[in-house]
Amino acid sequence: MKKLISPNQIGFMKHMGTQDHVFLLQTIVEKVVKKNKKKLYVVFIDFKKAYDTVNRNRLFDKLRKLGINGTYMKNIEAMYKRTEYCIKLKAVHTPPVLSNLGLKQGCPLSHMLFNLYIDDIKDIFDDRCEPITVQNTKISHFLYADDLVILSKSKEGLQRCLDKTHFYSKINLLTISVKKSKSMIFNSSGKFIRNITFHIGDEKIEPVQEFCYLGIDFKCSGTVKHGANVLNDKGNKALRPLMNVIARFKIPPKTAIKLFHTYISPIITYNTENLSKFSDNEIKKFKDDGIFEATAKSKIDTTHRKLLKFIMGVSRSCPNLAISGDTGEIPLSLKSYRLTLNFWHRVTNMDNDTLVKKALLENISLRTNWIITIEKLINTLNIADKIDDPSKFRHATQESLERKWKTWWRQALDNPELSRLTFYREIKNEYGYEEYLNLTNFHQRKLVSKLRCSDHALEIEKGRHKPANVRKRKEERFCIYCDKNAVEDEKHFLYDCTLYDELRKQYHIWRDETYALFLKDNLSETKDFIFKAFSLREENVPSALSG
């Protein structure tokens, strides 16, 4: 298959994906626009119902010219000898209609046949089209199935390409949707150049300032439109109905997390292989834990954390360190780094004649931020010795990312400058999913989560959010429910406050060196005590305030 099809076409090809051509386009933009400060003229072509309008006789002629004969060719012709279609209306089918055009829908062979049908488009482009050179290879176009990108160094060259493409489509009975096709002029100033236009036949192609190519929004400046933000917004939109389902059917947290990674995570991490790169400033100040500091603030994790906080029942302001620690979830931004490294490793081992491999070599010669990020990640994760073995490299990448993230998490949690999570530091020994999250009663789960993660209404936290003119220092946020003149923190609430003395007698709650394990080892008593204690606290608010 690869021998018959040009490397410019990667649609439905084994070991190839949309990220390959996104990477190729980004590389060309990086070289022409950002490094050489020149304009790049591009048209994104949309074929109208390309699969449905393939001329079968012309397809068979092309297959024979490619050397496909004998039994294989006879079988293909037999498949299309008599093709009938009908429409199902409820339980009734319309009379069958014969069809002499198009490829069969749902047939696994159709993708390959279409690739072979359109592959000879490569022969129409020549040097007068003024192609872009990447690693000594001239590129005037590339395809992902029927998504065609045509590009040139000049407006004259691009128009010449379009004239040839228009003629090609006529001969091959393909229809170009001019309304859906768009032109863009990439330039270093980022200006929307609308006075230079292109046409297909007599129809003008609409110039645009940005275009969504294979799911990624490119701007005429050459940048990707808020890459991580856009993907996160798409994920957030898909999360809302999932959260409704979780709440309606009371889906357990573990199952909810699995659903998130099945349906939402792929949306957020789509094509992040090309987005995972540090800025110039980040690279300059990069240090060993730099990727983890960036991860803690990454916007790509916003939707993920939103789901975790939702199933835990905590507020948006609940510390992310506690959310990660109690769910045991690894941030999606780290997954994007893993995907980036795996993508780089896959392309590194490709044949040199593939366009994406040439794009990688171009990145290396240009010393782009993307390549520098790859180098930084490999050095930080200490996985350079695993590069020669694909399976070991993938495993080592994931293992090292998770291990170093957990180490960074513990160090961040133990930071003495972190005023919040004092109680959490004492009760949380290891990074991982906590059993209390399996509580089926959401209100009980919520109360335990809030107490553990410093997201409660005790004075130690409540006082933090008061206006500056009445806010008290941490050591002055006293409990108003007893006369011990003590700070109302988690330990005081659990063990010391006299308001709950009678309640404690109903449970095996005591203070000794093992108290930090209480919330974990005595879960059945913990949830009941916390629930009743907070209820008692609410009942006594008026009298406490008056006293």
Regions found by a protein language model. Name each.
Residues 1, 25, 46, 63, ...:
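Mobile genetic element proteins and their domesticated derivatives, centered on retroelements
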Residues 10-20, 32-37, 47-53, 65-68, ...:
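Conserved, non-catalytic sequence blocks in retroelement Pol enzymes and Pol-derived host proteins
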Residues 6, 13, 145-146, 177-182, ...:
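Non-catalytic, peripheral interaction segments enriched in hydrophobic/basic residues
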Residues 49-66, 141-170, 187-189, 220-224:
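Catalytic palm subdomain of template-directed nucleic-acid polymerases
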Residues 261, 287-288, 296-304, 315-462:
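Extended C-terminal regions of large enzymes
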Residues 91, 175-209:
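Short, conserved micro-motifs composed of acidic
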Residues 1-116, 120:
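Conserved pre-catalytic core of RNA-dependent polymerases
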Residues 414-417, 421-547:
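Family-specific functional microsites
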